[in-house]
Amino acid sequence: GCLVTGQALAQASSTAAKQHIVIQVSTPETRIWSQALNYVENLQSLYGKDNVEIEIVALGWGIGMLKFDSPLATRVADTLKRGAGLSACEVTMSRQKLQKQDMLPDIGYVPAGLGQIIKRQRDGWSYISG
């Protein structure tokens, strides 16, 4: 027969449960953005791509890396292809006089970045600061 301990069952069920993670990036620093994109890859490897939902929310000065001329445009596109969400704060876009045509294709938009992060946390998502 097969003996499974309560601890093993708890670990298996917690691994099987879909993880939901929101990552805030509010800095224009390339190294911080690279780190946030690495988080996505690492978390997808850890949990399995289909077992984790990840959204990076860019606000404040961090929104620049989602512009069409971003030095990380290729990495952002790769992250989107892997199924992670990248959302730009429309409040920040308005303040910085950015339009959707200034931004990378296929990203998402949220009315307020902080509001989105608060909503995700209220819905049980884990929070990571990029």
Set out the residue ranges of the language-model regions.
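Secreted/extracellular ectodomain signature
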Residues: V4, A8-G130
